Amino acid sequence: MWFKNGVPTLGELTVESVAGTTGNTVITVSPKPIGGHKLVYKTAASTAPSVAYDDDLSKWTEFNNGDEITATNGHKITVAEVTADGKARKSGSADVVSGE
């Protein structure tokens, strides 16, 4: 957990999107989630979805690091590391690169 002036703050993830099969991208994230946490993502056409510490992201899509997911080339993706109950702890964004 990161703190700024005694207040918990959102940590950072490095997110990479590389072309997968047609219409898909392979998403890799570092660092890997800590024990008990999981990765979730959300895409948007023009602006990467924003995340704040402790946001409830339980409605976002869960995935495993290195998975191939369906996403539109050129869209934005935000990946977050969340607690078991979906509370945001880290996030990062990237431009989607999908296979053509």
Segments predicted by a language model, with ranges:
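Short coil/turn motif common to extracellular beta-sandwich-like domains
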Residues: 18-29
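Solvent-exposed strand-loop boundary residues in beta-sheet-rich modules
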Residues: 6, 44-47, 83-85
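Proline-enriched interdomain boundary motifs that mark the N-terminal boundary
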Residues: 8-16
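Solvent-exposed loop/turn segments flanking beta-strands in beta-repeat/beta-sandwich domains
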Residues: 32-52
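Extracellular fibronectin type III
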Residues: 85-100
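Short beta-strand segments within Ig-like beta-sandwich modules, predominantly Fibronectin type-III
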Residues: 53-64
